[in-house]
Amino acid sequence: MAMADQRNDKPGRPAAQRERRGWLSRIAPGVRNFAKRETPENLWVKCPETGEMIYRPDLEAALWVTPSGHHMRIGASQRLAVTFDDGQFEKIDCPQVVEDPHKFPDDRAYPDRLKAARKQTGEQDSIAAAYGHIRGQPAVVMVQDFAFMGGSLGMGAGEAFIAAAKEAVKRQVPLVIFTASGGARMQEGTLSLMQMARTTLALNEVKDAGLPYVVVLTDPTTGGVLASYAMLGDVHLAEPNATIGFSGRRVIEQTIRETLPPGFQKSEFLVERGMIDQVVRRADLPEVLGSVLKTLMMGRERLSPAA
């Protein structure tokens, strides 16, 4: 009987254990799910310059400038929000263009690359344009997004540039661009190279209207973009340590078979040699831009009666 009682006791213990396990199993998934919701995967960002891990909200509050002073690349929407007063602006609609006119052969179809870039950036092409106020001064601002296929210049970006230039002339306000590009978009061939000439002609209309055109060079500004509208401004500003040049450093060194000086093609190097006017920290850009634009527009108002 004693042995029988012991056998009868055994089923009771697993039942209690099952009850305890059931209680834990009910709360454990909730705790795990709560932890997942409260801890984003990209909570920490590594500084490209020093390797320091930076708390993402702190980096966003610092306008994506690391404690070491490194200016990280930011998207078009972020740039527009930071530049315009109170982050308020009106987006400028851009005409649609034919996609993949050359049926460019690649390991990944060009339309698929465009689709992925649009999903990543939320922009239609590498240039976004908007109208708003910078320290009270009305202006049309364009931003090149390097995350959109390296900020490459294609037909869509060219149309966006022209639409922005026309809007500036229509509203009689200054035109500003933040450049960031690797150059012309190879998938569009000669149609991409045509945009260098088309954007230059659009700028002629802005200048014929007596309106200022200010360029802010950000990292990196290279290739056909530098050879066209990036160097046609009335005033050229640049962010710190931005790479600015037509060809890459290694390409130049291999071509001329010489070692280039330290800091070559960096904004600080270029301002010392008179190629750009001023290097400005990102946090100070709205104030500096507002001051420059107001000064240039005051000069235009003084000249307009004589004209």
From Swiss-Prot:
Subcellular location: Cytoplasm
Residue ranges of every copy of the CoA carboxyltransferase N-terminal domain listed in the record: 43-307
Pathway: Lipid metabolism; malonyl-CoA biosynthesis; malonyl-CoA from acetyl-CoA: step 1/1
Alphabetized InterPro entries for the sequence: AcCoA_carboxyl_beta (IPR034733), Acetyl_CoA_COase_Trfase_b_su (IPR000438), ClpP/crotonase-like_dom_sf (IPR029045), COA_CT_N (IPR011762)
UniProt-recorded Gene Ontology molecular function terms: acetyl-CoA carboxylase activity; ATP binding; carboxyl- or carbamoyltransferase activity
Pfam families: Carboxyl_trans
Alphabetical GO biological process terms: fatty acid biosynthetic process; malonyl-CoA biosynthetic process
Keywords: ATP-binding, Cytoplasm, Fatty acid biosynthesis, Fatty acid metabolism, Lipid biosynthesis, Lipid metabolism, Nucleotide-binding, Transferase
Catalytic activity: N(6)-carboxybiotinyl-L-lysyl-[protein] + acetyl-CoA = N(6)-biotinyl-L-lysyl-[protein] + malonyl-CoA
Gene3D superfamilies, A to Z: 2-enoyl-CoA Hydratase, Chain A, domain 1
Region annotated Disordered, chain positions: 1-21
Keyword Protease: no
Enzyme Commission number: 2.1.3.15
Record-level GO cellular component terms: acetate CoA-transferase complex
Ranges that cross the membrane: none
Superkingdom per UniProt: Bacteria
Purpose: Component of the acetyl coenzyme A carboxylase (ACC) complex. Biotin carboxylase (BC) catalyzes the carboxylation of biotin on its carrier protein (BCCP) and then the CO(2) group is transferred by the transcarboxylase to acetyl-CoA to form malonyl-CoA.
Complexes and interactors: Acetyl-CoA carboxylase is a heterohexamer composed of biotin carboxyl carrier protein (AccB), biotin carboxylase (AccC) and two subunits each of ACCase subunit alpha (AccA) and ACCase subunit beta (AccD).
Family: Belongs to the AccD/PCCB family.
Protein name stated in the entry: Acetyl-coenzyme A carboxylase carboxyl transferase subunit beta
Species, as recorded: Phenylobacterium zucineum (strain HLK1)
Source taxonomy: Bacteria, Pseudomonadati, Pseudomonadota, Alphaproteobacteria, Caulobacterales
